[in-house]
């Protein structure tokens, strides 16, 4: 695998992961942001705070990528989080796109060890995916619709083995931000139908 191919792959993955994060965030209602499912668990608002602060810290300290913006939005409501994360992560995407393929293979500090930037970036992606998964559970507990992140959900049709479709809430960051100003787009979800939506019902 060439350095350029690896860089293009990482950047393309980051772009889709950014949209997935924004899409999950968009499914929460304003009143949901304070929901705490257990005393030691983060609320949705705290997960959004963590995502913004953590990604800002990793990008500045491990990749030297500055956005020129504060880590957090001026107000901690859902629309402000959506706009701010979209803006900051887009700026990071553009800055990373200007780096050459060899840059990704160079080592950087990863807490108390040194790893290649590509290695660290993969950890950043899965770190974000981990917390996004936690938020998806909160959506289910709150009774909110569960659109696809990577594949079918019980709401989009059940199990992949039963030929359930993948239904994303948004196809682009631009449409998401535009629609969320006016209540959002809510594509119809068919539900699981007659077959069980889980493997061991």
PLM regions and their residue ranges:
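Residues within well-ordered alpha-helical secondary structure of globular protein domains
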Residues: 27, 50-53, 87
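Residue-level recognition of alpha-helical structural elements
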Residues: 3-6, 40, 74, 78-81, ...
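Surface-exposed helix-capping loop/turn segments at secondary-structure junctions
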Residues: 27-34, 94-105, 141-147
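Solvent-exposed, charged/polar functional surfaces in cytosolic regulatory/catalytic domains
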Residues: 20-23, 27, 91-95, 134
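Helix-adjacent hinge/juxtasegments
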Residues: 60-101
